[in-house]
C-alpha cells in the first residue's frame, strides 16, 4: 500500500499573483442588459449608451474591485470610467472619482445590479431604446437595472 500524506501547495504572492494587477477581475466583460438586450457601451468622447452588437469594441469593459462589493467599470477601448453625476446622468470620466464607484450585487435571478455608491438609491440602467436611464428614475425590481456579465475575451 502507498503511504498517504498531505501535499502542500506553494502559497500565492500576497498581491494576488502576477497574472493581472491586484483588484482587477481577470477577463474583460460585456454587461448585457435584460431590458432590450443591449450591451452597456462606453464611448471615447464620454457618452454612455447601449448597443446590441456584441462585436462593438466599446462594449468591452474592465471591472475593478475597490473594496468588497464595490467596483469601478472602465471601458477598455475608451479608457474611461463609468460615472453617475449628481443629476443622474451616466457619462464616462477620464479619471476615477467618487462618482465612478458602484455597489455590485448578484440578485436572486442571477443578474447583477450596479448601484451608485455616492447616490445610493440610484442604479446604472438602460432603457428599451438603448439610451441610459437617469439614476433618479431607477429603482429595485426594474428590468432596466439588471445586467448579465458575459466574457469579452477576444
Curated annotation (Swiss-Prot):
Annotated SUPFAM superfamilies: Cytokine
Gene3D superfamilies linked: 2.80.10.50
Compartments reported by the entry: Secreted; Nucleus
Keywords (A to Z) from UniProt: Angiogenesis, Developmental protein, Differentiation, Growth factor, Heparin-binding, Isopeptide bond, Mitogen, Nucleus, Phosphoprotein, Secreted, Ubl conjugation
Cellular compartments per GO CC: extracellular space; nucleus
Phosphotyrosine, modified sites: 81
Site feature Important for interaction with integrin, where: 127-128, 133
Start and end residues of each stretch annotated as Heparin-binding: 127-143
Propeptide regions on this chain: 1-9
PANTHER family documented for this protein: FIBROBLAST GROWTH FACTOR
Protein name according to UniProt: Fibroblast growth factor 2
UniProt source species: Mus musculus (Mouse)
Higher taxonomy: Eukaryota, Metazoa, Chordata, Craniata, Vertebrata
